[in-house]
Amino acid sequence: MFKSGFVAILGRPNVGKSTFLNHVMGQKIAIMSDKAQTTRNKIMGIYTTETEQIVFIDTPGIHKPKTALGDFMVESAYSTLREVETVLFMVPADEKRGKGDDMIIERLKAAKIPVILVINKIDKVHPDQLLEQIDDFRSQMDFKEVVPISALEGNNVPTLIKLLTDNLEEGFQYFPEDQITDHPERFLVSEMVREKVLHLTQQEVPHSVAVVVESMKRDEETDKVHIRATIMVERDSQKGIIIGKQGAMLKKIGKMARRDIELMLGDKVYLETWVKVKKNWRDKKLDLADFGYNEKEY
């Protein structure tokens, strides 16, 4: 008998949702940074064994939106409640429950589907603090299970996976066993470039960046994959920061991104990066759609 199911990973920004998904999948399919709202699109991670398939849906961190992009991200996250059989509600062990958590809990109660509370970052707290956190969240909602983990170190992750697989129902194998995500390579390439911008820039720049892969094709002469990517920003000052003195920052972004892209593709890559200004794109629906943030996602 083959079992399968869809599982959403929900929570506030920066609680470790993408770190958890990457750990389960054994490779990077969701970019990570210490900046809030790193994940902007729903990202599917397909975990398959001989007898089971769990389709995880990593979601943008739920926050109070200030732009049309923020609205898209939050609606995209909540839309998964209509698509899954189980929700992993992830919270950090080293932060007390806040208004953002309460807002999510109210939506989860209304959804009327099983919710597993996943308390991440247990490596950062004393066991007594962890017990207090569990009691506090349990007082707010009747969770199906509570599982403390460290997504970064992998502590207790196998326990969580076993809990999910034990509760799967008989079903189809929705995806081939060698497929690990639903996103095309172009999307993953654009995310890897954006990840390096997030790592290397500060203040308002990370939130104002989108990356569009203009072309991606193999050069038969050099046997390299030639990629042309444009980094979009909202202001000229941001363009200057990303390019850097004599192009140094842009070169660094390109060099770091190329390494990750080559690992993912298993090919040598020639990465060409450009920077363009598109004023206030985060509040323009046409621009959002052009840059891959389309309401059709939800």
Swiss-Prot record:
Q: Name one GO cellular component term.
A: cytosol
Q: Which UniProt keywords apply?
A: Cell membrane, Cytoplasm, GTP-binding, Membrane, Nucleotide-binding, Ribosome biogenesis, RNA-binding, rRNA-binding
Tell me the segments the record calls region G5.
149-151
Where in this chain does the record put each Era-type G domain? 3-170
Annotated region (G4), positions in chain: 120-123
Gene3D superfamilies named among the record's database cross-references: 3.30.300.20, P-loop containing nucleotide triphosphate hydrolases (3.40.50.300)
Q: Name one GO molecular function term.
A: ribosomal small subunit binding
Protein localization? Cytoplasm; Cell membrane
Pfam families of this UniProt entry? KH_2 (PF07650), MMR_HSR1 (PF01926)
KH type-2 domain spans which residues?
Answer: 201-279
Q: Where does GTP bind?
A: 11-18, 58-62, 120-123
Ranges for the region named G2 are 37-41
User: Which InterPro entries does the entry mention?
Assistant: G_ERA_dom, GTP-bd, GTPase_Era-like, KH_dom-like_a/b, KH_dom_type_2, KH_sf_prok-type, P-loop_NTPase, Small_GTP-bd
Q: Where is this region: G3?
A: 58-61
An example Gene Ontology biological process: ribosomal small subunit assembly
Where are the residues of the annotated region G1? 11-18
In the bilayer, the protein is annotated as: Peripheral membrane protein
Provide the primary localization: cytoplasm
How it assembles, according to the record, is:
Monomer.
Q: Which family does it belong to?
A: Belongs to the TRAFAC class TrmE-Era-EngA-EngB-Septin-like GTPase superfamily. Era GTPase family.
Q: What does this protein do?
A: An essential GTPase that binds both GDP and GTP, with rapid nucleotide exchange. Plays a role in 16S rRNA processing and 30S ribosomal subunit biogenesis and possibly also in cell cycle regulation and energy metabolism.
Q: What's the protein name?
A: GTPase Era
Q: Which organism is it from?
A: Streptococcus pyogenes serotype M5 (strain Manfredo)
